[in-house]
Amino acid sequence: MDIENNLQDLKKKFSDVERNLENPTNLSQKEFVSFSKEYSELRPIIEIIDEYNILKEEISDLEEIMKDENSDGDIKELAKEELLEKQKIVLPKVKAKLKLALLPKDEDDSRNAILEIRAGTGGEEAALFAAMLFRMYQKYAERRNWKFEPISISNTGIGGYKEASALINGTEVFARLKFESGVHRVQRVPETESSGRLHTSAATVAILPEVEEVDFEIEEKDLRIDVYRSSGPGGQSVNTTDSAVRVTHLPTGIVVIQQDEKSQHKNKAKALKVLRARLYEIERQKKEMERSTMRKSQIGSGDRSERIRTYNFPQSRITDHRINLTSHRLEQIIKEGELDEFIEALISRNEAERLTGGGNVTF
């Protein structure tokens, strides 16, 4: 794709969208929403295009000064310095920004996300770690002014979580959290360990884009839905009605159990939401595998079996193994959800990879 040949088309398209939004009374609600979405997507690109065009004009003016035989020597010298800076430093940066803005976006980046955490190897210590991660993401959601709504939590006897899930609503939730999927490992001395030995435990994190029924339909014939009485720790019944729901997707064998709500209807709705997200993620992974044959991602595929991060408590250290980034702010990250140091680094690495792989976008 020749960028120069597409910039004017994009500016014209943006002008058309602006013109339509200036007269919203002429639009249906659906058209207004569509144009508004298009406007918000195009505006940041147009701003970079304008920056690029202004820079080209400035470079052209400086080149004219250099060519002008009547220009003063001192002025020419200043123009030469400024021209070199703009050509060698400023222009490549603006081109990189523009190239990145024009690369195809992940269509799921704007979606909300479903967080799923499962305790892995390590017994009760792994369950405690899973609960800690769940609270860490809850704190991070609060920092971002996102809504964090627990869907289901399977408790253990001493405060750990065997499994936990939550729906996170807000701006660009999936875009910021999608690189958190994988195996998280903890190294620490358990409070229950009398000998003071260091234990290694793990928990699996999955970040799934939330999808609505209209976006991803599940055939009714592919589902088996069972209802039963919900139970608490130890198996004792906590409800006198059949409110718990188990949904089985027959083609894949995926099972989702939901019993946190007192209403069977609400439990079924939540279970179907989680199932829809899991099935959609399977399709996403298939597409990602196809893309990865063309581009190998250094920050990982989002495979849940991939060990991505280690939390070392004795050294107050967190290391992300995909980008070799280490932070010694373990307590702030775990307790306050100060994850942006890692999330921003992962997003930057992903952008760099996309730029490297975007060879079909040229100036």
Curated annotation (Swiss-Prot):
GO terms for molecular function: translation release factor activity, codon specific. Peptide chain release factor 1 directs the termination of translation in response to the peptide chain termination codons UAG and UAA. Methylated by PrmC. Methylation increases the termination efficiency of RF1. Residues 286-305 are annotated as: Disordered. It is found in: Cytoplasm. Its main location: cytoplasm. This is Peptide chain release factor 1. SMART domains: PCRF (SM00937). Keywords: Cytoplasm, Methylation, Protein biosynthesis. The modification N5-methylglutamine is found at Q236. Belongs to the prokaryotic/mitochondrial release factor family. InterPro entries: PCRF, Pep_chain_release_fac_I, Pep_chain_release_fac_I_sf, Prokaryotic/Mito_RF, RF-1.
